[in-house]
Each structure stands twice: as C-alpha cells, then as structure tokens.
C-alpha cells in the first residue's frame, strides 16, 4: 500500500514532469541560477539529497533575488526521472500557474 507521503511526492513529480513538457521548467544548477538572475524563475525545487555545495549555491542565488527555494525529500535520480533525464539536483518553474499547483502540494 502506498503511503500518503509517497502519493504527495508522486503527484509533485508528475506536476514537475508536466511543467517540463509545457516548456516551463529549467533543469540543472547552472541553468537554474542563470534563470534566477534573468528574473524568469518563480520557484526552485531541489533535492534534499543534493550536495552541500549545490544547496548553498541555490540558496544564495535564490535568497539574493527573492525567489522561493524548496527542498523536497526526493533523490536526484527520482527528480531526473520525473523529467525524462538523468539525475538532477534542482529544477526551476517559470510559470505562475504551475507554481500555484506545485506549492499547493508541498
């Protein structure tokens, strides 16, 4: 039987995958930081298992530019699989409607 927490994580990963298909997602630490600096990012989602250096870079950049960064209990492999890629530590959402959907599930 699937726990409630696992259902919520699966729903979150599905929404991230949908954002990817809609072209509203940026993938990877460097690309996410560049998008934050460009003012496009509405929300950053990162794996809680990301390296300390990656977490620091994301947090510093997001905090400086006033972007919300959420760390979720998924592995980089799971996050990557949700978007059809290899392991990735973080993604950013560029669309306000997807942000509303995703934050209601965090």
Q: What residues fall within each predicted segment?
A:
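Long, charged, low-complexity intrinsically disordered regions
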Residues: 1-3
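N-terminal first-folded block
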Residues: 5-46
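Short, ordered loop/turn segments at secondary-structure junctions
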Residues: 30, 49-50, 74-77, 96
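N-terminal positively charged helical leader segments and presequences
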Residues: 37, 41-60, 66-68
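Small/polar loops that bind or transfer phosphate-bearing groups
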Residues: 46-47, 71, 90, 94
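Mid-chain, well-packed structural core segment of small domains
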Residues: 56-86
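C-terminal structural segments of small proteins and small subunits
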Residues: 76-106
């Amino acid at each position: 039987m699937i726990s409630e927490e696992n259902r919520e994580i699966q729903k979150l990963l599905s929404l991230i995958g949908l954002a990817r298909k809609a072209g509203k997602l940026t993938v990877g630490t460097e690309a996410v930081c560049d998008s934050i600096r460009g003012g496009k990012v509405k929300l950053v989602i990162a794996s809680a298992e990301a390296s300390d250096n990656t977490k620091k870079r994301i947090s510093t950049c997001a905090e400086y530019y006033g972007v919300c960064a959420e760390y979720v209990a998924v592995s980089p492999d799971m996050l990557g699989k949700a978007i059809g890629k290899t392991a990735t530590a973080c993604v950013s959402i560029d669309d306000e409607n997807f942000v509303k959907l995703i934050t209601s599930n965090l």
